[in-house]
């Protein structure tokens, strides 16, 4: 006959084992649900879109015009073309992930004041642009805008500019062509870096439907490359920009400016940034 204490201990350990297994199962189930939700809504994190009606009227200082392209059925691409009074060329500006040209169009003055036109597209689902989102579609759209621009501007008078998410469009475009220069503000080597920084507890590599492998595309770039990044960037880790810079071919002119107190969206506020950008816009080198 078993000792009563043994029976009590056996029952206790069985209870603990059952509770532990039940807890682990519940945690695993919850983790799976979180992963599923992340996979389902990730576009809302990556692309913070703001739509505008086709009839919306922009109001910016200086001359500008709207450009509409329809490269495929059910796809409408929209951009603003800002004109400088005495032009040195055109900056093809790929903006960040949030808002629309209603917000980003204000940035054009930074270039037009220095004699550069600015062609600034909205991505699919942003502003007046329409179409189904995918990484391949965004890359194709960026190429369409570059091709359109080369019909109006010589390639050696085009600077491709990518701001944060916009680097994911700017780098492949520059890699496939021969613009005057490639300028990247707060860029990433790939989107996995940003995801790891924000969602490190999730299997982000398996869940992400967007990679934006700038670190691979930039190896094919033949024009000068200028990278600006803040060490305190809470969205795109500084180390990601370092990896991107390391991937730039040694055969091209390259420079990386680090801002010790810089965050993600404040780099234009630094005098050093403005000074170097003035040099780039003045010489393209």
Give residue spans per PLM region.
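An N-terminal hydrophobic leader/cap segment in hydrolases
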Residues: 23-70
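C-terminal catalytic histidine-bearing segment of alpha/beta-hydrolase fold enzymes
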Residues: 243, 250-285
